[in-house]
Amino acid sequence: MEGQRVEELLAKAEQEEAEKLQRITVHKELELEFDLGNLLASDRNPPTVLRQAGPSPEAELRALARDNTQLLINQLWRLPTERVEEAVVARLPEPATRLPREKPLPRPRPLTRWQQFARLKGIRPKKKTNLVWDEASGQWRRRWGYKRARDDTKEWLIEVPGSADPMEDQFAKRTQAKKERVAKNELNRLRNLARAHKMQMPSSAGLHPTGHQSKEELGRAMQVAKVSTASVGRFQERLPKEKAPRGSGKKRKFQPLFGDFAAEKKNQLELLRVMNSKKPRLDVTRATNKQMREEDQEEAAKRRKMSQKGKRKGGRQGPSGKRKGGPPGQGEKRKGGLGSKKHSWPSALAGKKKGVPPQGGKRRK
């Protein structure tokens, strides 16, 4: 009995070892292409198993992914390893596949005004050492920055110049001069950025004044300022004789989340019917108004054209300087007097008629 149990245990151990080896060892018709630098494995084998899987190939996909991952891990274990802080690390080779960049290449940094001038004049920068000898402290110190050599800000005594006011605070004057230098450097930096981006910077003299604002612009600005509150100008105080603002926005009314399901279904079906219909939806009122508007425009254009023709016909002059048609101008003689054909006057002025007394006073005998 004991010998039989030992044989069973040995057989079970051999079976487990075989299963482990089977999990590690994967057979492929075509070997995979590996790019260990990018941890990439490309499988060129035809997916015959996936074609035979049917409509649900999830299990086959998992098995295929597991086999390919196992082959990739086997390749990683063949790389040279080293121990770093109680951990085994493998050095990956250089990647062979070029991956596309997520973002474009960075643009070269634009040159400052001094760099442009130095390039134009051929000035080359001279490298200066970071440390210089400080005679006051007797040691090497930084050229710039904190604990620099010849740091005049740490002096407790400042000599007053002969041309300066003896009552002026030289320490405050030095601090103010430093602030001005910092502000000037910042302004130059912003100008360089604006020049690089081709922007227009305001002048040091100040912003240019704006033009005269009309009544409409001031009213529009006042209306925008009034509605720029949390209540959209609803609780804003008004002047005694101020009118209510026009065009105040109306509150949107949304449909309730839980309501008439039949009406909602009807609206959705109507929307789908309109979207699926091949014929365009015709608005009779809008089409009629458009047709009437076009007819009115055509009539107005025709009248305008006729009036222009009449003006040209009555305003042209002949070679002798006389008008062809139209009322006579200054300096022209009327042909035919008062009874001419072109300008007819009342019959009482043109001649006698029976039963009509003559006008213009008594006649002389």
Swiss-Prot record:
Subunit organization: Component of a hexameric 5S RNP precursor complex, composed of 5S RNA, RRS1, RPF2/BXDC1, RPL5, RPL11 and HEATR3; this complex acts as a precursor for ribosome assembly.
Q: Which GO terms describe its cellular component?
A: condensed nuclear chromosome; endoplasmic reticulum; nucleolus; nucleoplasm
Please state the gene responsible for encoding this protein: Rrs1
Q: Which residues carry this modification: N-acetylmethionine?
A: 1
Q: Where is the composition biased (Basic and acidic residues)?
A: 235-245
Give me any GO biological process, just one. protein localization to nucleolus
Q: Where is this region: Disordered?
A: 200-255, 281-365
| Protein family according to the UniProt entry | Belongs to the RRS1 family.
Pfam families attached to this UniProt entry: RRS1
Q: Which domain of life is it from?
A: Eukaryota
Q: Which residues carry this modification: Citrulline?
A: 273
Q: How is it modified after translation?
A: Citrullinated by PADI4.
Q: What does this protein do?
A: Involved in ribosomal large subunit assembly. May regulate the localization of the 5S RNP/5S ribonucleoprotein particle to the nucleolus.
Identify the keywords attached in UniProt to this record, alphabetized. Acetylation, Citrullination, Isopeptide bond, Nucleus, Ribosome biogenesis, Ubl conjugation
Principal cellular location given in the protein's record: nucleus
Query: Cross-link Glycyl lysine isopeptide (Lys-Gly) (interchain with G-Cter in SUMO2): located at?
Result: 154, 226, 266
Compartments it resides in: Nucleus, Nucleolus
Give the organism's phylogenetic lineage.
Eukaryota, Metazoa, Chordata, Craniata, Vertebrata
Which molecular-function annotations from GO does this UniProt entry contain? Answer: 5S rRNA binding
- InterPro entries from the xrefs? Ribosom_reg
- Name this protein carries in UniProt: Ribosome biogenesis regulatory protein homolog
What residue spans carry the Basic residues bias annotation?
302-325, 351-365
